[in-house]
Amino acid sequence: MLLRWLARPAERCLGRGGGGGGGGGGDGLLWHAELKPHASGEYSIAVAQANAELEDQGQVVTSPAATFVGVYDGHGGPEASRFISSRLFPHLHRFASEQGGMSTDAIKRAFHATEEEFLHMVKRSWLKQPQIASVGSCCLVGAITDNVLYVANLGDSRAVLGRRGPDGREVVAERLSNDHNVAEEEVRKELTEQHPDDSRIVIYTRGVWRIKGIIQVSRSIGDVYLKKPEFARDPIFRQYVCSIPLKRPVMTAEPSIKEHQLRQQDLFLIFASDGLWEQLTDKAAVDIVFKNPRAGIAKRLVRAALTEAARKREMRYTDIKHIERGSRRNFHDDITVVVVYLDHHKHGVRPNLGNRNSFRFTNAPVDIFSGSSEEVDHHPLRLNLAMDGAVG
């Protein structure tokens, strides 16, 4: 019962629609929340849905001492990204609290705990629902505390820092995450070295590089059949889900983690799923944030990406926004964007992350059907229940 309650946090507040903060200017598949405060500034969040079921999930958790951002880009279905949205932060809070503060080790342990918990769920469910073994999600996390930013990721969602340039009038884009995607030559080389006896570990098919001809990302939460060969070898799974046999794991859940000391010239952060970065360069995105008002800035980035997606098809954004979910995936991917402004940097004693009552949760909707619902801002009591479920 508790897991079902946790699995759909946004749905409890939104129903199954989205659209807080006034919707997307006539786009029923674009949702955003109004500008909100965090420990060292303000943040903005927006989501555009393309798939029949929204496979992206985004969340921001704030307290007086810390800010946490999560962007989870699912594939094969929404189950993994929704699972991460309900489980990762409770694990991270627990491990960081046990260690007396945020650290790369606490983040790594939280990722591993989430992966193991998802694996257990798959083992319980997969005989009745074999496709659950093929569901996965990229996972991008940012945590700010005591003037230090931690960025951790699996997959190809991306965190980009906008910092003031030397002349003070321009902004420089600095990427803070690694793309675990076989489109990157370095990732292909890594896989080839790990699988020297498999000449087909990475295949160019359908216009892109894919691991075993199946998937583009090399690290994720989930995708159990590509990490646990016994699932891929099962006759039922091979008949109904994937017929390619595997001898050993071809993906991992080992996050790349970067620790960055915030500086006065660091102005803002953009966390986004690859749906944004498929359309906009890092520099184009930071220029949009730097040159425009804060109100609705995440929505502005999403609309810029949708405009570019339309341009590539010799269309206008006004044409795309009338296309229904599902069909819209032919033009762009689901897009989740969180912009975090860095207005003041707090120095001093390493702070306690805060007790459970001090956190405020903002989750993007589970699905977006309209532009009229209220934005999601979870009461601390709900977070208490989530924490209790994680620790128990």
From Swiss-Prot:
Cofactor: binding comment: Binds 2 magnesium or manganese ions per subunit.
Q: Which residues form a coiled coil?
A: none
SMART domains attached here? PP2C_SIG, PP2Cc
- Which residues belong to any copy of the PPM-type phosphatase domain? 39-342
Q: Which UniProt keywords apply?
A: Hydrolase, Magnesium, Manganese, Metal-binding, Protein phosphatase
According to its UniProt record, which reaction does this protein catalyse? O-phospho-L-seryl-[protein] + H2O = L-seryl-[protein] + phosphate; O-phospho-L-threonyl-[protein] + H2O = L-threonyl-[protein] + phosphate
One GO molecular function term of this record is: metal ion binding
Leading EC class: hydrolase
Q: What is its EC number?
A: 3.1.3.16
* A Gene Ontology BP annotation from the UniProt entry: regulation of intracellular signal transduction
| Family under the similarity heading | Belongs to the PP2C family.
Protein name as annotated: Probable protein phosphatase 2C 78
Which organism's genome codes for this protein? Answer: Oryza sativa subsp. japonica
